[in-house]
């Protein structure tokens, strides 16, 4: 089973479709982590409800784009993801 990371910024309707496909076996994987660029993204609520680890990496919270990118990479490595889905 592959570990997926989802990068989200909005309501999470695509994320919900992926969650459903994983649950039904249509996708042989599980969502290991959700990373949002938006503190207000409803996708974070969906992730919380499904007990999926989730983080916000908003560019205003970092001194540079490179610092934010390093944090995203750190999270991807921490969860040992196989695929990143945008």
Residue ranges and their predicted role:
Residues 1-86:
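One-carbon transfer enzymes
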């Amino acid at each position: 089973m592959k570990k997926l990371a989802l990068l989200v910024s909005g309501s999470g309707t695509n994320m919900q479709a992926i969650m459903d496909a994983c649950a039904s076996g249509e996708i042989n994987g599980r969502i290991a982590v959700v990373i949002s660029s938006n503190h207000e993204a409803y996708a974070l609520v969906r992730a919380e409800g499904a007990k999926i680890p989730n983080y916000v990496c908003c560019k205003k919270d970092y001194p540079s784009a490179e610092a934010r990118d390093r944090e995203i990479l750190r999270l991807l490595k921490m969860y040992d993801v196989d695929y990143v889905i945008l």
